Structure formats: structure tokens, C-alpha cells
């Protein structure tokens, strides 16, 4: 948003303070289910922040798959690393965490999200400059998740409606 808005935008300095963080998503597809007694795990103290049995979600194909997210901190340090090295490292971490062989996966895919998340923010989900008649909103205002993009857009629409009706 900052690149689209003029320097005189009232919230220009606040927007300059926003910094998106990276994340790696690793998808592992297996011929047979792994022996896990959970569908999702949020982790601390490791370079992996999230592991989910993606195939357990409603409406997903029956093929057994795991979705793995790195921590933002680890990703930030390794955003420009070789993709194969990142895959190998994350696979080794997953294998260590779940105590099972993940190298038998028939599908291994990695996606690098340069702008995946944002550090915890205040409650400001949108930025309106009524003087210049400009506004900014997005996932980057709150938490860097798709839900926050919708909430931020919804909040902006409500606020604009209030302004226009006054």
C-alpha cells in the first residue's frame, strides 16, 4: 500500500513501520497415512511452527498429506537459501518432531512466502485519511492472514459507509 499512496497520506509514517515476515510452506504427500494421533500441532522451540494433516480437512482429497509451516523467524534468516536445502532441512525437522520417516513422501513441494505474516500489531485494522480521501487496509494491518484481509476490508467498508452517511 505504501508504494501506492502519496507521501502526504496522513498515515504514511505508520505504514512505513509495517514489516511483513516470511514463511516457508512444505507440502508432503504420502501413499499411506502416517501414524499420528492428531490432525494439527502448533509448535514452539523449533524452526517449525505448524504441522497439519491437510487431508483431514473437510472437502480435501483422500490422499494423505501434511502441511508444514516454518517459523517466521527461521524463514526470515533463510529466505534466499537454496530451495532443495530448505526442503531437506524442513523434512529433517518434521521427521525429528513426529518421529517418523517423511522421506518416503511421493510428493514434496515447497512454497516461499516472502510476505506471509506480520508481528503482533495494535488494533488498527485500517488507515483512513479523510483530508486526502484515501484509505489503506489489508492483512498486513493485523496478522498477515487471509481472514484479516477480509476483516480489514469489511472494517474499511463499514467506516467509509459511516463517513459517507454523516
What are these regions (language model features)?
Residues 23-27, 48, 65:
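Short hydrophobic/aromatic beta-strand or adjacent loop that forms the aromatic wall/cage
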Residues 47-56:
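Short, solvent-exposed beta-alpha or beta-beta edge segments that form flexible loop/patches at the rim
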Residues 56-63, 107-136, 140-142:
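FAD-binding beta-loop-beta segment adjacent to the flavin cofactor pocket
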Residues 35-47:
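Short, glycine-/small-residue-rich phosphate/pyrophosphate-handling segment
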Residues 1-38, 100-103:
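Central helical "cap/lid" subdomain
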Residues 128, 133, 138-165:
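A conserved FAD-binding loop/helix module that cradles the flavin
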Residues 34, 60-65, 70-114:
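Flavin-binding catalytic cores
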Amino acid at each position: 500500500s505504501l508504494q501506492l499512496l502519496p507521501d502526504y497520506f496522513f498515515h504514511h509514517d505508520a505504514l512505513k513501520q509495517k514489516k511483513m515476515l516470511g514463511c516457508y510452506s512444505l507440502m508432503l504427500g504420502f501413499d499411506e497415512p502416517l501414524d499420528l494421533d492428531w490432525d494439527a500441532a502448533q509448535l514452539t522451540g523449533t524452526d517449525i511452527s505448524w504441522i497439519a494433516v491437510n487431508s483431514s480437512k473437510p472437502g480435501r482429497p483422500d490422499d494423505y498429506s501434511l502441511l508444514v509451516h516454518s517459523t517466521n523467524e527461521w524463514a526470515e534468516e533463510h529466505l534466499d537459501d537454496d530451495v532443495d536445502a530448505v526442503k531437506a532441512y524442513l523434512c529433517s525437522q518434521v521427521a525429528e518432531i513426529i518421529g517418523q520417516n517423511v522421506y518416503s513422501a511421493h510428493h514434496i513441494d515447497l512454497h516461499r512466502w516472502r510476505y506471509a505474516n506480520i508481528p503482533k500489531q495494535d488494533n488498527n485494522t485500517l488507515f483512513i485519511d479523510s483530508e486526502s480521501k484515501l484509505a489503506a487496509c489489508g492483512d498486513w494491518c493485523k496478522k498477515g492472514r487471509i481472514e484479516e484481509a477480509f476483516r480489514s476490508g469489511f472494517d474499511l467498508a463499514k467506516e467509509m459507509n459511516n463517513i459517507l452517511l454523516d
